[in-house]
């Protein structure tokens, strides 16, 4: 007999935001209900907030569409940010020198699960 799937996952890979900055936002929503998490993200003035919100909405849509889960019963069971590829650039400086610039990217992952009441 097949086991009932009770979680759904969404990822955004190679997003142009530093992982350190994205983790600040992701830490706010971990363990919260999806309604509360969306409210938090809507009013958090960080560049990563819209990115994480989009991934969360995608995870909710995956849960509803693919696994027939009720969005009212969902919470953010996992949310983490891994480091993606780094774009390496150089900034010209005085006397013919150059300084390196690392444009960091992130892989944002959000997993939503059903509450076991």
Curated annotation (Swiss-Prot):
GO terms for biological process: translation. One of its GO terms (molecular function) is rRNA binding. GO terms for cellular component: cytosolic large ribosomal subunit. The keyword Protein transport does not apply. The keyword Nucleotide-binding does not apply. It comes from the Bacteria. Gene3D superfamilies: Ribosomal protein L22/L17. InterPro entries: Ribosomal_uL22, Ribosomal_uL22_bac/chlpt-type, Ribosomal_uL22_bac/org-type, Ribosomal_uL22_sf. Keywords: Ribonucleoprotein, Ribosomal protein, RNA-binding, rRNA-binding. This protein binds specifically to 23S rRNA; its binding is stimulated by other ribosomal proteins, e.g. L4, L17, and L20. It is important during the early stages of 50S assembly. It makes multiple contacts with different domains of the 23S rRNA in the assembled 50S subunit and ribosome. Part of the 50S ribosomal subunit. Belongs to the universal ribosomal protein uL22 family. This is Large ribosomal subunit protein uL22. The gene is rplV.
